[in-house]
């Protein structure tokens, strides 16, 4: 029986992509795991049917090289594309460095779009599935995450449009709205710009950047197992996974905006 194939971006050790790569591998897939530097995926190197590819989603030449490599492996098809690579940016909007902000959009929005466009012939040939790993922040809009949340909200709008545009070709599109997940990808020694108007709340902002403000997080392994289950069930549209993800859905769906504002401000620790 021919193995199904999946390409996953952002598979550095300790992150969601790595856990997804292992979960797909356990299901018998040929996994094409990517990261900017392959040395960050050495924990996956010795697994059978695990192909490691250096790939920066902001570099079109690297994406084209990955397409060519996978075409040679599969004969021109790809069953699943998982756009997981992403960068965070925790900063008050007034303090945002615009060059850095544009780079966040390059990785979180334009990167997935580049991947989808380049791999679309392979996905259409396989009647495959595109999975965009998103964040509940794109809907709950927490403080200090304005740039990051905006990039993920743009990705959600793109995904939902693509979901309908690709229906005639039998290609599914799934957005995974991710809650709190235990990973190793947090900032350390966070500091605001010295002239920031928000220095009085630097401690609270730093706690969020360093991942210490929320003790309860779903393990990346459990998260990945559930997400892979959603993907293999051919469930297009939107799914919510990770700690507090379902709660976030109901808050956005049912809570009046003024109450959401109160909760958001309280959770940020400001008055």
UniProtKB/Swiss-Prot annotation:
Superkingdom, natural source: Eukaryota
Pfam families the UniProt entry points to: adh_short (PF00106)
Enzyme class: oxidoreductase
Role noted for this protein: Short-chain dehydrogenase; part of the gene cluster that mediates the biosynthesis of the indole diterpenes penitrems. The geranylgeranyl diphosphate (GGPP) synthase ptmG catalyzes the first step in penitrem biosynthesis via conversion of farnesyl pyrophosphate and isopentyl pyrophosphate into geranylgeranyl pyrophosphate (GGPP). Condensation of indole-3-glycerol phosphate with GGPP by the prenyl transferase ptmC then forms 3-geranylgeranylindole (3-GGI).
Keywords annotated in UniProt: NADP, Oxidoreductase
Protein name (record): Short-chain dehydrogenase ptmH
CDD domains: 17beta-HSD-like_SDR_c
Taxonomic placement: Eukaryota, Fungi, Dikarya, Ascomycota, Pezizomycotina
Active site: residue positions: 148 (proton acceptor), 152 (lowers pka of active site tyr)
Residues that coordinate or bind NADP(+): 8, 34, 40, 56, 84, 148, 152, 181, 183
Enzyme Commission number(s): 1.1.1.-
Pathway: Secondary metabolite biosynthesis
A single MF term (Gene Ontology): acylglycerone-phosphate reductase (NADP+) activity
Gene Ontology BP, a term: triglyceride catabolic process
Gene name, Swiss-Prot/TrEMBL: ptmH
């Amino acid at each position: 029986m021919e193995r199904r194939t999946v390409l996953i971006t952002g598979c550095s050790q300790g992150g969601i992509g790595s856990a997804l790569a292992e979960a797909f591998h356990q299901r018998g897939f040929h996994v094409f795991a990517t990261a900017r530097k392959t040395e960050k995926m050495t924990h996956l190197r010795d697994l059978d049917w695990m192909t490691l590819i250096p790939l920066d989603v902001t570099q079109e030449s690297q994406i084209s090289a990955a397409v060519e490599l996978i075409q040679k492996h599969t004969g021109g098809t790809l069953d699943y594309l998982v756009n997981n690579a992403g960068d965070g940016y925790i900063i008050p909007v007034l303090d945002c460095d615009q060059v850095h902000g544009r780079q966040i959009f390059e990785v979180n929005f334009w990167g997935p779009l580049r991947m989808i466009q380049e791999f679309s012939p392979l996905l259409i040939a396989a009647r495959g599935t595109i999975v965009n790993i998103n964040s509940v922040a794109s809907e709950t809009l927490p403080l200090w995450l304005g740039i990051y949340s905006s990039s993920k909200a743009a990705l959600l709008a793109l995904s939902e449009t693509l979901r309908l545009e690709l229906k005639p070709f039998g290609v599914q599109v799934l957005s995974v709205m991710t809650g709190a997940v235990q990973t190793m990808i947090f900032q350390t020694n966070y500091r605001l710009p010295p002239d920031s108007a928000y220095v009085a709340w630097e401690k609270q902002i730093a706690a969020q950047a360093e991942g210490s403000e929320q003790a309860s997080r779903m393990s990346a392994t459990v998260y990945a197992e559930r997400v892979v289950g959603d993907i293999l069930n051919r469930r297009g549209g939107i799914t919510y996974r990770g700690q507090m993800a379902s709660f976030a859905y109901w808050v956005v769906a049912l809570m009046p905006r003024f109450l959401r504002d109160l909760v958001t401000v309280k959770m940020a620790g400001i008055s």
